[in-house]
Amino acid sequence: MVFFVALILAVWIATGTGWAASYEDNGNGTVTDETSGLLWQQADSYHELKKGMNWYEALEYVALKNSEKFAGFDDWRLPTRDELKSLYDKSRPVKSKGGERIGLPPVFKSGGSYYLWTTNERGLDNAWYFGLGFKEDYFNLKELGDLDQGVKMVRGKPATE
């Protein structure tokens, strides 16, 4: 019996499946992560703006959406790296704006950014962003951005890093 439990645990760890997350499309441009309780923007900034952005522009985008009370709320924020990692779906069913397969659950919209900014800073001049293709962490100068870096806003209590 102990061997069987150990075998199941080893397969679970090796495959990286973990416990399946459950997401609900709220029908108002948001998705609820029923495991964490976080509320996510269903699309991302690229869907709306058709451009990438640097970290400072990402903060401005969130401030604008809060002033507009996106989906009825004014407490949206950039996610932490851990929060973005928690969304990762290794089957990569969603496609980015460039057609690359990315690791978002199918309840999220295809056609968005490949990389998403996080609230996490690295020193004074850099901030972290997350690659949805293969669950990659990167950092860049805050004032630099390219066509692939965007924002997927979240609200709720931040995950600790």
Where are these regions (language model features)?
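Bacterial N-terminal signal peptides
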Residues: F4-G16
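An exposed tryptophan-centered "aromatic clamp" motif
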Residues: L59-D75, R81-G131
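Short, structured beta-strand segments at or near domain termini in extracellular proteins/domains
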Residues: K142-E161
